[in-house]
C-alpha cells in the first residue's frame, strides 16, 4: 500500500505551494442532469450553489480553474474560465479532452460539478502520485472513478483518438497512457468515509446534503 507523504509539515506545505503554480483544475459541467431534473451544479448547499464550493476548494490547489460548459452565462459568475464543451457532444470524455487542451499547466485535476465534499488533502496526494504517470485514477472496488482524477495534457491526443473511433467511455483511453490506478484501500486512508467521491445524480441523493449526512 502506498504510504502517505511523511515529510515534515512545513516542508510538505512548501512543496504544495510550489506545486499550485503548475496544476490546472477542470470542472465538468456539461451534462444535462436528466436524472436530477435540474442543473446539479446550481443546487444549494449550505447557502451556495454546489459548483461554488467546488471552485473554492480547487483554489487551494490551482491558479488555473476551468469549467467545461456551453452555459457561460450560468457559470461565469463563479470566477473560473469557461471552456466550451467538445463538439459534437460526447459526454465526460470530450469534456476532459477540451479541458486538457486549454489547460495552462501540464497536469490537471479533474472533478465533476456535483461533488460537494471534495477533500483537498486527498486531491493533493493524487497530484503527488502523478510523477511518472499520465493518469492517476482512484478506484471504488473494481470500478474506476475517472471524474475525480488527475491527468496530464498528454492524455488529450489519446482521448481524441478514442472519440474519433466512436468511444464514449472515459476509461477507453486508459490502455493508451501510463495509468496509476489508486485502489480503494489506499485513498480511504485519507478519506475513510469516501465522501470526496460522492456525486449527486438523482433527487434521492439530495438527502446527502442534509446536516446529519454531511456532518458524519
Predicted feature locations:
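Long hydrophobic alpha-helical segments typical of transmembrane helices together
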Residues: 202, 214-216
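Short, positively charged and aromatic/hydrophobic N-terminal segments
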Residues: 3, 12-14
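Nucleotide and nucleotide-moiety/phosphate-recognizing core
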Residues: 17-167, 172-194, 207-214
Amino acid at each position: 500500500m502506498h504510504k502517505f507523504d511523511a515529510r515534515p509539515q512545513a516542508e510538505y506545505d512548501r512543496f504544495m505551494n510550489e506545486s499550485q503554480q503548475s496544476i490546472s483544475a477542470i470542472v465538468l459541467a456539461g451534462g444535462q442532469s436528466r436524472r436530477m431534473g435540474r442543473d446539479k451544479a446550481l443546487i444549494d448547499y449550505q447557502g451556495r450553489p454546489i459548483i461554488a464550493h467546488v471552485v473554492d476548494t480547487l483554489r487551494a490547489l490551482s491558479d488555473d480553474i476551468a469549467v467545461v460548459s456551453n452555459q457561460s452565462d450560468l457559470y461565469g459568475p463563479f470566477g473560473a474560465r469557461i471552456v466550451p464543451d467538445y463538439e459534437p457532444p460526447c459526454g465526460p470524455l470530450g469534456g476532459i479532452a477540451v479541458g486538457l487542451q486549454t489547460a495552462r499547466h501540464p497536469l490537471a485535476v479533474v472533478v465533476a460539478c456535483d461533488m460537494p465534499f471534495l477533500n483537498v488533502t486527498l486531491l493533493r496526494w493524487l497530484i503527488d502520485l502523478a510523477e511518472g504517470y499520465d493518469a492517476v485514477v482512484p478506484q471504488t472496488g473494481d470500478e474506476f472513478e475517472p471524474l475525480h482524477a488527475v491527468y496530464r495534457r498528454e492524455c488529450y491526443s489519446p482521448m481524441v483518438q478514442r472519440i474519433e473511433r466512436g468511444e464514449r467511455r472515459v476509461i477507453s483511453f486508459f490502455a493508451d497512457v501510463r495509468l496509476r490506478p489508486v485502489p480503494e484501500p489506499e485513498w480511504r486512508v485519507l478519506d475513510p468515509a469516501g465522501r470526496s467521491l460522492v456525486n449527486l445524480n438523482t433527487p434521492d441523493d439530495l438527502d446527502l446534503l442534509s446536516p446529519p449526512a454531511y456532518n458524519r
